[in-house]
Protein backbone atom coordinates (compact mmCIF):
# COMPACT_ATOMS: atom_id res chain seq x y z
CA UNK A 1 0.00 0.00 0.00
CA UNK A 2 1.28 3.43 -0.99
CA UNK A 3 1.14 6.22 1.61
CA UNK A 4 1.22 9.82 0.46
CA UNK A 5 2.09 12.61 2.86
CA UNK A 6 0.34 15.66 1.37
CA UNK A 7 0.62 19.02 3.15
CA UNK A 8 -1.32 22.07 1.98
CA UNK A 9 -0.04 25.55 2.82
CA UNK A 10 -2.05 28.74 2.93
CA UNK A 11 -2.06 30.47 -0.44
CA UNK A 12 -3.20 33.75 1.15
CA UNK A 13 -1.43 35.44 4.01
CA UNK A 14 -3.61 35.96 7.08
CA UNK A 15 -4.76 39.61 7.06
CA UNK A 16 -5.20 41.41 10.36
CA UNK A 17 -7.03 44.68 10.78
CA UNK A 18 -5.55 47.71 12.50
CA UNK A 19 -7.23 50.05 14.96
CA UNK A 20 -5.17 53.05 13.80
CA UNK A 21 -5.34 55.09 10.63
CA UNK A 22 -7.80 57.88 11.43
CA UNK A 23 -7.49 61.43 12.69
CA UNK A 24 -9.81 64.41 13.01
CA UNK A 25 -9.46 67.36 10.67
CA UNK A 26 -7.57 70.32 12.16
CA UNK A 27 -9.73 73.28 13.21
CA UNK A 28 -7.28 76.02 12.14
CA UNK A 29 -7.45 77.90 15.42
CA UNK A 30 -5.19 80.77 16.49
CA UNK A 31 -4.26 84.30 15.42
CA UNK A 32 -5.39 85.36 11.95
CA UNK A 33 -4.01 88.92 12.14
CA UNK A 34 -0.75 90.16 13.68
CA UNK A 35 -0.13 92.99 16.14
CA UNK A 36 0.09 96.34 14.32
CA UNK A 37 -1.65 95.04 11.20
CA UNK A 38 -4.38 97.14 9.54
CA UNK A 39 -7.79 95.42 9.35
CA UNK A 40 -11.24 96.25 8.02
CA UNK A 41 -14.45 95.90 10.01
CA UNK A 42 -15.67 92.30 10.18
CA UNK A 43 -12.19 90.78 9.81
CA UNK A 44 -11.51 87.71 11.94
CA UNK A 45 -8.66 88.43 14.36
CA UNK A 46 -8.45 85.26 16.47
CA UNK A 47 -10.16 81.85 16.29
CA UNK A 48 -10.38 80.01 19.61
CA UNK A 49 -12.31 77.58 21.78
CA UNK A 50 -13.25 79.30 25.02
CA UNK A 51 -11.86 82.71 25.95
CA UNK A 52 -8.09 82.32 25.75
CA UNK A 53 -7.98 85.94 24.57
CA UNK A 54 -10.69 88.44 25.53
CA UNK A 55 -12.27 91.07 23.25
CA UNK A 56 -11.03 94.60 23.89
CA UNK A 57 -11.94 97.94 22.34
CA UNK A 58 -13.84 97.72 19.01
CA UNK A 59 -13.65 93.91 19.00
CA UNK A 60 -16.66 91.57 19.06
CA UNK A 61 -16.98 87.95 20.10
CA UNK A 62 -18.85 85.44 17.94
CA UNK A 63 -20.91 82.46 19.06
CA UNK A 64 -17.89 80.14 18.75
CA UNK A 65 -15.68 82.64 20.70
CA UNK A 66 -14.09 83.97 17.49
CA UNK A 67 -12.83 87.54 17.89
CA UNK A 68 -13.55 89.98 15.03
CA UNK A 69 -12.96 93.67 14.30
CA UNK A 70 -15.96 96.01 14.59
CA UNK A 71 -14.24 98.94 12.84
CA UNK A 72 -11.40 99.59 10.40
CA UNK A 73 -8.14 100.13 12.24
CA UNK A 74 -4.91 98.72 13.66
CA UNK A 75 -4.80 95.52 15.74
CA UNK A 76 -3.19 95.57 19.20
CA UNK A 77 -2.67 92.51 21.40
CA UNK A 78 -2.52 93.71 25.04
CA UNK A 79 -2.36 92.41 28.60
CA UNK A 80 -5.50 92.61 30.71
CA UNK A 81 -4.36 92.42 34.32
CA UNK A 82 -1.76 89.88 35.38
CA UNK A 83 -2.86 86.73 33.62
CA UNK A 84 -5.29 87.70 30.86
CA UNK A 85 -4.81 88.90 27.30
CA UNK A 86 -7.06 90.95 25.07
CA UNK A 87 -7.09 92.16 21.50
CA UNK A 88 -8.26 95.65 20.52
CA UNK A 89 -8.67 97.57 17.27
CA UNK A 90 -7.86 101.29 17.25
CA UNK A 91 -8.95 103.69 14.51
CA UNK A 92 -6.17 105.31 12.51
CA UNK A 93 -6.13 109.13 12.23
CA UNK A 94 -5.86 110.07 8.56
Swiss-Prot record:
Q: Which GO terms describe its cellular component?
A: cytosolic large ribosomal subunit
**How is it modified post-translationally?**
The N-terminus is cleaved by ribosomal processing cysteine protease Prp.
Picking any one GO biological process from the record gives: translation
What is the organism of origin for this protein? Staphylococcus haemolyticus (strain JCSC1435)
User: Which Pfam families does its entry note?
Assistant: Ribosomal_L27 (PF01016)
Query: Cross-referenced PANTHER family, in alphabetical order?
Result: LARGE RIBOSOMAL SUBUNIT PROTEIN BL27M, RIBOSOMAL PROTEIN L27
Gene3D superfamilies tied to this protein? 2.40.50.100
Taxonomic lineage is: Bacteria, Bacillati, Bacillota, Bacilli, Bacillales
Q: Which domain of life is it from?
A: Bacteria
Pro-piece positions: 1-9
The entry assigns this protein to a family as follows: Belongs to the bacterial ribosomal protein bL27 family.
One annotated GO molecular function is: structural constituent of ribosome
Keywords from the UniProt entry = Ribonucleoprotein, Ribosomal protein
**Name assigned to this protein:** Large ribosomal subunit protein bL27
| Matches recorded under InterPro entries | Ribosomal_bL27, Ribosomal_bL27_CS
Amino acid sequence: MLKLNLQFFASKKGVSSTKNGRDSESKRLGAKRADGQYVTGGSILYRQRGTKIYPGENVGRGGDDTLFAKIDGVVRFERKGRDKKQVSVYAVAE
